[in-house]
Structures are given as C-alpha cells and as structure tokens.
Swiss-Prot record:
It comes from the Bacteria. Pathway: Carbohydrate biosynthesis; 3-deoxy-D-manno-octulosonate biosynthesis; 3-deoxy-D-manno-octulosonate from D-ribulose 5-phosphate: step 2/3; Bacterial outer membrane biogenesis; lipopolysaccharide biosynthesis. It catalyses: D-arabinose 5-phosphate + phosphoenolpyruvate + H2O = 3-deoxy-alpha-D-manno-2-octulosonate-8-phosphate + phosphate. It is found in: Cytoplasm. Its EC number is 2.5.1.55. GO terms for molecular function: 3-deoxy-8-phosphooctulonate synthase activity. NCBIfam families: KDO8P_synth, PRK05198.1, PRK12457.1. Belongs to the KdsA family. This is 2-dehydro-3-deoxyphosphooctonate aldolase. One of its GO terms (biological process) is keto-3-deoxy-D-manno-octulosonic acid biosynthetic process.
Length: 281
C-alpha cells in the first residue's frame, strides 16, 4: 500500500524512507542541560546521517504525584526552544496539553505533539489541527491500533493531514506496558508515518509508588524489534544522568550511549528497508 510522506523542512518522514529520530530529553530541566543534550544529539545524528528533530516537554501535566517536577512552563519553555533552534538549526517538537497552548507552541515548534492520555480530547485535537502544524499523535495506552483512525479523522475533518502516529505501548494489567508488534501493521493501513517511542514503552506506570519505573536495560532490544517493522523512525529520550533525572529517568538512555545505540539501529533500518516487500495476505 502507498505510504504518505510528511515533510518538516528538508526532512522526509515516511515508513518507506530512511529512519528519522525524534530525540531529546523528557522535560526541560534547565536551559544548560537542554543545550548539552541537543548538542550531543546533533553531533551523533550528523555523524551517522540520521535526520533529527529535538524533543522536550515544557510541562509534564500528568505526573503521578502533585509534588513531582513539571517543567519551566509555557513562556520559559518557548524561550529555551527558540534558543535551541537558533543555536543548532534543528526542527523542534513538544507536546500540547490545553487548546489555548496550540497556536502559541506552533509558532515556535515545527511539530506539535498530542499526548497519549489526551488523544481522545476532541477540543484539543481540533485546536491543534487548526494550527496547520505537523502533529505527532501518541497512541493512548488504552486504545487499540485500529481506534487511531478516529483521531486521524478528527484532524482531517479540521483541515489537517500533516499527521504522524506514534506507538508507546499498551497497558498490560497494572503498572506495566507491552508493545504489540502486530499493531504497527494495523496502523500502516492508514498510510501515515509511524514512529516508535521506545523509551516510554519501557515505562512501568506508577511502579515506584509516586512516579513511573522503567526498564532502561532493555531499550536496545525493544528498539531493534520496533525498527525491524519498517517504520518511519524512532522517538527516544536520553539524559546525562538518568538516575537523577527529574522525570522518567528509569526509561531514559544514558546520553553517552547515544552513538553506539543509534549506529546499530541505523544499520538495522537500512537492512530491513533493503528487502523487497513480500505480500503474504
């Protein structure tokens, strides 16, 4: 089946094109750390020839505990993003949590992200779609792959077909997520690019009582499984010191492992996409 291509500047995002990377950190902890993280991503992706979009959140609106760090907020977050874009000349992606934020974020960021927990909130979906920006739609942990069609239709009816789907795992009992690899094939029927959010798929929601646990040691194994499915690319979070990260440290790749990690995945992506398509239906 034909696969759509979404363009962000010079980057082409499609399931049948070389992998792209949406990568960065979970939340903006500080301006200096954001610059450090982006600099390393840029160095590695330029060396390996991987198209790159910087990712971070200005607000984590769905933390487990009221005492958990949320981020610098919208205004300061946009200032940091603008500096990153000026300094490194990279496209940006961040998530939007309320309808009134959509237009403000779309003025700064090249891609706006619909959070998984909010993916059925029609007012938010429509507000984001009406900006005309490219939208990365996270698949909710509680939705079946085929149900993503309804969210795509909401965006299309609001006049936006610049859409990307992102798998981040499905709830499996309590405090656990699993990734159904068959779901990628289901979502490919919609013809939009699909990313795999490998770090969030390793979450153990509420696994540490007041915050999420995770399985960082398995990040390469799961990333290889996802990339083997002929996807548009990977969504990845890394941190200089994951054990002391302010959010989702147990899932984050160590920043100093970024280059060997991505080198293996790029080689795998090239191998998988070199094979002819075999129709088995």
């Amino acid at each position: 089946m034909a696969q759509k291509t979404i363009r962000v500047g010079s980057i082409e995002i499609a399931n049948d094109k070389p992998m792209v990377l949406f990568g960065g950190m979970n939340v903006l902890e500080s301006r200096d750390m954001a610059m450090q993280v982006c600099e390393e991503y840029v160095r590695v992706t330029e060396k390996l020839g991987i198209p790159y979009v910087f990712k971070a959140s200005f607000d984590k609106a769905n933390r487990s505990s009221v005492n958990s760090y949320r981020g610098p907020g919208l205004e300061e977050g946009m200032r940091i993003f603008e500096e990153i874009k000026r300094t490194f000349n990279v496209p940006l992606i961040t998530d939007v949590h309320e309808p009134h934020q959509a237009a403000v974020v779309a003025e700064v960021c090249d891609i706006i992200q619909l959070p998984a927990f909010l993916s059925r909130q029609t007012d938010l979906v429509v507000a984001m779609a009406k900006t005309g920006a490219v939208i990365n739609i996270k698949k909710a942990q509680f939705l079946a792959p085929q149900e993503m069609k309804h969210i795509l239709t909401k965006c299309e009816e609001a006049g936006n077909d610049q859409l990307i789907l992102c798998e981040r795992g499905s709830s499996f009992g309590y405090n656990n997520l699993v990734v159904d690899m068959l779901g990628f094939g289901v979502m490919k029927q919609f013809e939009y690019p699909i990313l795999f959010d490998v770090t969030h798929a390793l979450q153990m929601p509420g696994g540490r009582s007041d915050s999420a646990g995770g399985r960082r040691a398995q990040v390469l194994d799961l990333a290889k499984a996802g990339i083997s499915q002929n996807l548009a690319g990977l969504f990845l979070e890394a941190h200089p010191d994951p054990d002391n990260a302010k959010c989702d440290g147990p899932c984050a790749l160590r920043l100093d492992k970024l280059e060997p990690f991505l080198a293996q995945l790029k080689s795998l992506d090239e191998l998988v996409k070199s094979f002819p398509i075999v129709e088995t239906a």
